Amino acid sequence: MTVVVIDVVGLTRRLLPHMPALRSVADAGTCATLDTVFPALTCPVQSSLLTGSLPRQHGIVGNGWYFRDLGEPLLWRQHNALVGGEKVWDALRASTPGATVANVCWWYAMGAATDWTVTPRPVYYADGRKEPDFYTNPASLHDELAARIGGFPLFDYWGPTASIAASRWIVAAAERILARHRPDVLLVYVPHLDYDLQRYGPDGPQAAAAAAAIDIELTPLLEACQERGDQILALSEYGITAARRPVDINRALRRAGLLAVHTQDGMEYLDPWTSRAFAVADHQIAHIYVADPAEVARIRGIVKELPGVDEVLDTDGKAARGIDHPRSGELVAVAEPDAWFTYYYWLDDTRAPDFARVVDIHRKPGYDPVELFFDHAGPRRAKLRAATALARKKAGLRYLMNVVGLDASVVGGSHGRLPDSADDAPLLICSDPTLDKDRIAATEVKDLIVDLHRRVSC
């Protein structure tokens, strides 16, 4: 039997009533509040779930950070070597030699010592084209899945066309691996709730509809697990809360004479090498990197006065939150509950770099949820530009998919700070009723997975 760990992104008590299949697992088993880690972001929390440690130990301080040795802010790296500490698969094999693990789309999948790996990986052609694809290990799994369920729907995974199709594909891949390969532990990442809850917030009809939709997609997998006697562990890294106040932290640093840019072809680019301070914005937290230690206190005061900023963590504050790691900024800003940080650093939109208006998660020096929308300044024109660019792409011509706007006020929800309400905290649902806990720390989940495997193996 298998321990099936399903990361249902954004799952909270507020949404569970709209999810009858998951609710039935909770009713028959255990439903607990997951005490997440700070920052409550995808990569740090997943790393804590799988290592049983805090960011100060595993080193994943955000979805990205300033790589000081490279002089570049980089987000959404994929190699597992970035994550420090013992991983759950190492602990599992120490407990049960020969135990097997499959990872379907949890982050930092590449290079991990799992037995089966599936993760999004586009094809980057030499002529600049980007085409949907995915990476697997073993390599033969790629063709097996492609023949069975088709290619990975990359443009449904992120961007203005993000939809249920990506999660449907991921669940189908998980079902295939479970049925054919029967791993001892199966990790599955299901991102669908991330989309409309960031677009519209958690309180409207779109959130309820998204919860119901992903529950339908999960139902066959849950039923198959129940029939086989598998252990189901469904959880989330964070809850998404209403947040409609963007905070332009880098623009404030620039106006204070601290952030520097360089210009090419009329476009401004962040210059981290000569900046006295800049921020890597990541939802509701921002790592602020300060070149001169003597300026840290003054810069903290500047950022603390910005509307929408709740806290600015210094050395002691970072230690108290478990994020005192060399990759962290000298300061870490935390937004107020209804606010979030943009990465924008230009002061005139006509000087914005061309990547600002496209979906480009790797070139932007911070997270950009506005990528989930067609340009609100003219959505019809944006869709027409998309159609024109697609036609040029198919014709083998150069194209620019410039469909993303620069109006951050369109975003409806965010996450990253620790939850202020139990209704907004992430959940952990387990099919085993003997777990019998009201709260479980994210750092306890690694040991819980190993323990659940012992139970199903007996």
Segments and roles (model prediction):
Residues 8, 40-41, 65-81, 85-86, ...:
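Secreted, luminal/periplasmic, and some membrane-associated catalytic domains
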